[in-house]
Amino acid sequence: MEKALILSIFIFSLLLGITSYSIYISFGPLSKTLRDPFEEHEE
């Protein structure tokens, strides 16, 4: 029981960390350096 709880908490925090990092990259200060392929090929 204790092993399963620790594993589930680890997986949950790993997913939460990945989600938080991707949101930070998408909308944070580094988002200014991301290129937009749709804007480049707009006619």
Curated annotation (Swiss-Prot):
A Pfam family assignment: PsbN
GO terms (BP aspect): photosynthesis
Membrane-related topology note: Single-pass membrane protein
Keyword tags: Chloroplast, Membrane, Plastid, Thylakoid, Transmembrane, Transmembrane helix
Any one GO cellular component localisation term in the record: chloroplast thylakoid membrane
Location of this chain's protein in the cell: Plastid, Chloroplast thylakoid membrane
Cystine connections: none
Membrane-traversing stretches: 5-25
Keyword tRNA processing included in the entry's annotation: no
InterPro entries, A to Z: PSII_PsbN
Keyword Thylakoid: yes
Cited function: May play a role in photosystem I and II biogenesis.
Assigned protein family: Belongs to the PsbN family.
The protein's name: Protein PsbN
Gene name linked to the record: psbN
